[in-house]
Amino acid sequence: MKWGVVAVLATLVVAASAKDYFKETFDGSWADRWTKSSWKVSDGSAGEFKLTAGKWYGDAEADKGIQTGPDSKFFAISAPLATVFDNTGKDTVVQFSVKHEQDLDCGGGYIKVVPATSEKQMGEFGGDTPYSIMFGPDICGYSTRKVHVILTYKGKNYLIKKDIKAETDQLTHVYTLVIKPDNTYQVLIDLKEVASGSLYEDWDMLPPKTIKDPKASKPEDWDEREEIADPEDKKPEGWDDIPATIADKDAKKPEDWDDEEDGTWEPPMIPNPEYKGEWKAKMIKNPAYKGIWVAPDIDNPDYVHDDKLYNFKDLKFVGFELWQVKSGSIFDNILVTDDLEAAKKFAEDTWGKHKDEEKAMFDKVKKEEDEKKAKDAPPPPVDAEAAEEEDDEYEDKEEPSGMGSIKIPKEEEESGHDEL
């Protein structure tokens, strides 16, 4: 009983210590908290975000998010965190949901977390605005269907080296990124882990610990030949006396051959089946073989260990900066926190509560769309040539019975039956 009380208290302490730096579920006042960027507005290529639950959803109000539109536009919008997030010694959890309702064929669906140092640029927040974290799905055709995890280190952006597959259907999915003070990370989709590992191993933020010695050179006596000619092998006697071609003994002088006019007839030459080509000694394993020479590793003088790769001290904004050929993605339920369990609970209370109803409505809408397409579809085209061939098999015959014109197969008419 005591242990149970302790466990409950521990859970409460953890919950109490967790902090949400940003939480957005997109109600009717969402536009008061978000700033549309002026990026791309002047040239007319900037798109808009509108509040909607889309064509299918679990709850018409709770599932409202912001949707991109129209097609082939750039989209940029941002909002400030409640307070600047210094993640020193804390987990960093970035979570949001996205529904590619339009069956996205090419476009981004990722979120950016932006540092306070970019504050003066947020009015024109766009592709060149420095950010700290970029996370989420990116889809373009069949070649690009990945989850980006890009981290900024000392002013440079580094892409994750792992290939994480993005969800590509038309339903809502929750993407969660966790960065920990021990320099490890997790990526979850729909609260299931799809990737994890080390910031040191899965990004190239630091140079390698060791490098090949640039001053090293291959020793002169280093033998890289895996095989050598057998020094004991000898060329058979008479090998070089065998000609490459010989006269064709089966050839016959043509009957019309005139030696005086055509010259002395000689049979044509053909390849000699006994000829074996240039003699070469057989190859044997080289007893002196040492393998391919590789320069030895040495400590990299440029390597400096950093135990704070995870560390972002001034996270201040979240934003979407996207290009979409086919618009219609709906973003919702954004959370920046320092506690994964709090993020999971938030996802369960939002997406998790309505996902089954959304799927059911999606199936219903798709079924109705398919039925309408089938109903509105034009009849299959008539093969005019085939129809004409069929008609040619018959001829009109007038019968005295008063039944009018009937068609009788040609072959029956031409068979010449006598009337009884």
Swiss-Prot record:
Organism from which the protein derives: Chlamydomonas reinhardtii
Keyword Disulfide bond: yes
Family, similarity comment: Belongs to the calreticulin family.
Disulfide bond residue pairs: C106-C140
GO MF entries: calcium ion binding; carbohydrate binding; unfolded protein binding
Role played: Molecular calcium-binding chaperone promoting folding, oligomeric assembly and quality control in the ER via the calreticulin/calnexin cycle. This lectin may interact transiently with almost all of the monoglucosylated glycoproteins that are synthesized in the ER.
Positions of the UniProt region annotated as Disordered: 210-272, 357-420
Protein name, per record: Calreticulin
Compositional bias (Acidic residues): 221-230, 385-398, 411-420
Lineage, opening ranks: Eukaryota, Viridiplantae, Chlorophyta, core chlorophytes, Chlorophyceae
UniProt-listed InterPro entries: Calret/calnex (IPR001580), Calret/calnex_CS (IPR018124), Calreticulin (IPR009169), Calreticulin/calnexin_P_dom_sf (IPR009033), ConA-like_dom_sf (IPR013320)
Motif (Prevents secretion from ER) on chain: 417-420
Region of interest (4 X approximate repeats), residue spans: 194-259
